[in-house]
Amino acid sequence: MVTSPHTLATEAGLNVLRDGGNAMEAAIAVGAVITVTCPHFCGIGGDAIWIIADRSGRKNVLMGLGQAAEHLPNFQDAIPFRGPASTIVSAGAVDSWEKAHAYSRAHWGGQFGFSLLLDAAIGYAENGFPITASQLYWLDYRKTEVDGWPNFRTTFMPNGRRPREGETFAQPNLARSLKAIARQGAREFYEGELAARIARGLEAAGSPLTAIDLRNTRSTLEQPVSLDYRGLTLLAPPPPTQGISTLAIMGILREFDLSNVAEGSADYYHLCVEAVKQAFLDRARIADPNLVPQPLDQWLAPGHLARKAQSIKLDRAMNWPHPFKTGDTVYFAVTDRFGHSVSVLQSTYYDWGSGIVVGDTGILWQNRGAAFSVDPRSPNVVRAGKRPFYTLNPSMVLKGDAPYVLCGTQGADGQPQTLAVLLTRLLDYRLDPCEALSRPRFLLGKTFSDQRDSLKLEASVNDATVDDLARRGHSIAAIPALSPLAGQAGAIVIHDDGLIKGAHDPRGDGCALGPLD
């Protein structure tokens, strides 16, 4: 089964499975297509994180992350969210595809050639695809900004106007870049002629990234961080991602007997929100473990999490002035008939990344550099060669050694919040993926579209629950039902009897599909 936020990407992965490919091969095809069909959320100028597991007990995390440029500007103020100063981090997604392909061949008997897995993406870039409501929403949202973004209008508004929903949208320059990667391999992006064109385009745009920074970018295979949750094993990526925060939230909720708490009640939302607050108190310490020690055992120690749970007042909300950032990402997951599973996030950080399309490559570059701090006291302070704090944290749940639940979401700081809701609904309340994804969600804190430091609840939460939460001291702000602000998530559940259920979020354009045979 495949779940992704775009039907064409889901279909590309399904076709690989139908042709005998494994979950990793299908995921590469999905990831490539989605860089074309969801340019507002991700691209080959961004990053990727994969959680990988199979029935044999093998489990890994593939960290396709960039690093800060060797020659950085002297930042006096916060790093900008757009423009050349935000393009200070290289891009790891493409390298992760080839590393995933090698892993598939080495461990899962993969037979598909790397170039073949990019065919569908190249076709949609070259010949076009029907533009979606989601892409137009985010284009409209930034309509007052795009004139200042180099090469943006000519790439995403090629006729000098806003496209119409369903209109065919092609990206010929991106198609040429993808063809070069397919022909020469992923390192073409980092060391070949394409890399030289990328470096020239970045320099022309005013970015500090150079050909040397591209050449130094390599994804790494690491071990996931884990937490026991009611006899199941939750997996998350290690720092510099916020995966540890998701596990901490679940570890705090583990201290409460949710069988006595009605799903969707005021008690349910209150516990989830307060667990998020407690877990996020440690989050500012997350940084690149290559440069800053990360005491994971302390952060996930049962006693530490139990004390956080004990500090939650059931009748009163903790005060919460906390700066959040938000961003846009795509989540997709694949499981196959062999018991192999992958859970993946790809991202350019904010919607439309830095806003800069690099030269004639068609590549929209990420603004992940804006995730760094300029405060010298911060563990996440910007430094040459350092990886910034990453919001990306796909999730996987194991039952015994075998993959049981794959899930993840778009939404930057909202990701651990949405994951806590999804995981409790799937694991504690045994909802199927469609129901778990469709029910109301919340988002705590400021976002780029709402600077109120409030608890945002979807309008589908009933009035009595909203009133109860307000009485407990939560500062409530309503957002529309099925709002994209609450994340665009996906989930697959693999049952013991072989039944597989999957869905993608009704807040987006995607779907889940599986072969009928």
Feature locations, PLM:
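M16/insulysin-pitrilysin zinc metalloprotease superfamily fold
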Residues: 147, 243-259, 397-400, 404-405, ...
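Glycine-rich phosphate/pyrophosphate-binding beta-alpha loops
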Residues: 235-243, 329-333, 343-357, 408-416
